[in-house]
């Protein structure tokens, strides 16, 4: 059990989504005093403000600056900057894509604080694993050089959500301390032998009564794959993934298997393009099940359409991963 309020910090949460970074930090017992967040998704912002009512909304990252924050000290900057430009599943245009250039907004804010004599001591950034290999590694090298030129000492690791939750989701995390920081403790690596969480199975909620499906739905037995950002307007994608366990035969109309040989199932995305098999019938996972697969409390995104809930959860960071990293940052 973490000691409550052992640390008190001011946080700037960029590309904040539904608050996965802030929730993970809060779960360690760290107290967030001044709390700022920035995102342009009005639906995600609605969820964020509901769950963190004392946080200050800043709007687009392009409006965030030392002056905008009135010179407020920031102890930790977090950001899962847009990953579509670097995603293996996307077009991988990188910095040619407008979304890819938003990293430079992070660098601008860091430099702004440095120039005003209040450098942000810690940064924690997240992106898809594909960032490492994009453009023959030049994209990652550029990001690394920009941050080190700003005098941040960096640590990086690809972390898999499956070490914490039954979802196979690999993400690159970049942690930096300004001027090397005052702590000699390394944040990375984290791994199976370093975490205090167990990959518990996620119970399927209730039963499905839609789309002709009836009956109680069984628990997931294995590990789901990645919740990712896709267009919800492609409902047919639910049939492009493997749907049946390898231990069972593909029935009439089936398209494959539900789980891999190692118990890992295939990809969930923001359109909920993942299914559960029951008596040779299929249904999508519910938003609550997706919340559990990302480590959020049940109902974290409720009050909005399922379309928005799937999108928000697919774009979110996995909460227990952030919690594990934060425990290393603050030596908890």
Write out the residue ranges for each language-model feature.
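Core alpha/beta nucleotide-donor-binding catalytic domains of modification enzymes
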Residues: 2-120, 128-133, 138-141
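Class I SAM-dependent DNA methyltransferase catalytic core
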Residues: 2-6, 28, 150, 156, ...
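Exposed boundary/loop context
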Residues: 10-13, 17, 72-73, 83, ...
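Membrane-targeting and insertion segments and their boundary/processing signals
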Residues: 22, 80, 117, 121, ...
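Short glycine/proline-rich turn/loop motifs
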Residues: 84-89, 124, 300-307
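Conserved Class I SAM-dependent methyltransferase catalytic core
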Residues: 101-178, 182-185
């Amino acid at each position: 059990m973490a000691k409550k309020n052992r640390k008190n910090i001011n946080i700037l949460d960029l590309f904040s989504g539904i608050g996965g970074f802030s929730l993970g930090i809060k779960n360690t017992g760290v107290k967030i005093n001044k709390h700022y967040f920035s995102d342009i998704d009005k639906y995600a912002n609605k969820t964020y403000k509901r769950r963190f009512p004392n946080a200050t909304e800043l709007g687009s990252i392009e409006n965030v600056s030392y002056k905008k924050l009135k010179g407020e000290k920031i102890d930790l900057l977090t950001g899962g900057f847009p990953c579509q430009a670097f995603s293996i599943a996307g077009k991988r245009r990188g910095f040619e894509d407008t979304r890819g250039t938003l990293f430079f907004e992070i660098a601008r804010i860091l430099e702004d604080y440095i120039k005003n004599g209040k450098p942000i001591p810690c940064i924690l950034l997240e992106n898809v694993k594909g960032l490492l290999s994009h453009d023959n590694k030049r994209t990652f090298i550029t990001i690394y050089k920009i941050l080190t030129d700003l005098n941040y000492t960096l640590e990086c690791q690809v972390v898999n959500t499956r070490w914490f939750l039954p979802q196979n989701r690999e993400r690159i995390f970049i942690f930096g301390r300004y001027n090397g920081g005052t702590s000699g403790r390394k944040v990375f690596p984290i791994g199976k032998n370093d975490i205090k969480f167990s990959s518990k199975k996620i119970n399927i909620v209730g039963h499905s009564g839609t789309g002709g499906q009836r009956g109680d739905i069984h628990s997931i037995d294995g590990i789901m794959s990645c919740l990712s950002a896709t267009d919800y307007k492609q409902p047919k994608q639910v049939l492009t993934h493997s749907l049946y366990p390898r231990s069972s035969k593909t029935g009439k109309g089936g398209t494959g298997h539900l789980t891999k040989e190692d118990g890992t199932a295939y990809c969930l995305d923001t359109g909920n393009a993942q299914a559960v098999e029951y008596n040779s019938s299929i249904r999508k996972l519910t938003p609550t099940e997706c919340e559990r697969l990302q480590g959020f409390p049940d109902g974290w995104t409720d009050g909005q359409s399922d379309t928005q809930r799937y999108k928000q959860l697919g774009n979110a960071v996995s909460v227990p991963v952030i919690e594990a990293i934060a425990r290393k940052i603050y030596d908890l």
